[in-house]
Amino acid sequence: MKRLKGVIILLILLFTACGVEKEKGKEKEIEKLEYKGATNSYKYNLVIPQILNLQSEDISYFNLSLQENARLIIDELLESTDELKQDIPYEAIVNYQIKENNFGIISIVLKIYLYTGGAHGNTTLETYNIGTKNLKLINFESFFNENAQSYFEMKINDAIENEKKVKNTNGEEVVFFENPEVNIKNAVMYFEGDNIKFVFPLYELAPYSSGMPVFEFSKDEIKKYMK
């Protein structure tokens, strides 16, 4: 019954608090879809992108999966507040950035913040890269050849071992764990300008206080590893 009540509330909130706003300029094909809601127990503000005027199976999947993920986040938030009594409202915030680049790729970075109790919330990044020619989603395997993984991991290990200055997503210097295990497949990637950037999640290579490390490679440097 509690779950049914949550679903009914969720549907009401979705239909009454969903707004649309079109991006301007070069981003005119990206539409903002916004979900907002708040009570004494929780609050959420989820802003997700929707790609318009371009049609492909991957773009349809992208649009629908982001809508479904937003609904799941809200559903879980409602269920959590039903199950527990908390002093501080639980919170969910989602927003995104479109990264302009010279790779012919629509590169979108989704930032997700969730607080469901404890000392602090948790932030994660999701990235979505779509080729502007074939309108297909791009991942590490589809973009790079078989030699790329070992190259990137070698370069990242070298930067850590030699204590080169690496910054996190907030532009602050990262202090790494001792001898962290680098797996490039655990990072998300996006394209910006003439560079590709890899972002590792919290706790993967460094403590929470150091945030999410960002490693950047230029197009010229990685050209021989691109398919």
Predicted features along the sequence, with ranges:
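C-terminal motif of bacterial Sec signal peptides marking the signal peptidase cleavage site
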Residues: F15-A17
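Sec-dependent signal peptide recognition
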Residues: K2-L10
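Compositionally biased intrinsically disordered regions enriched in Thr/Gly
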Residues: G19-K227
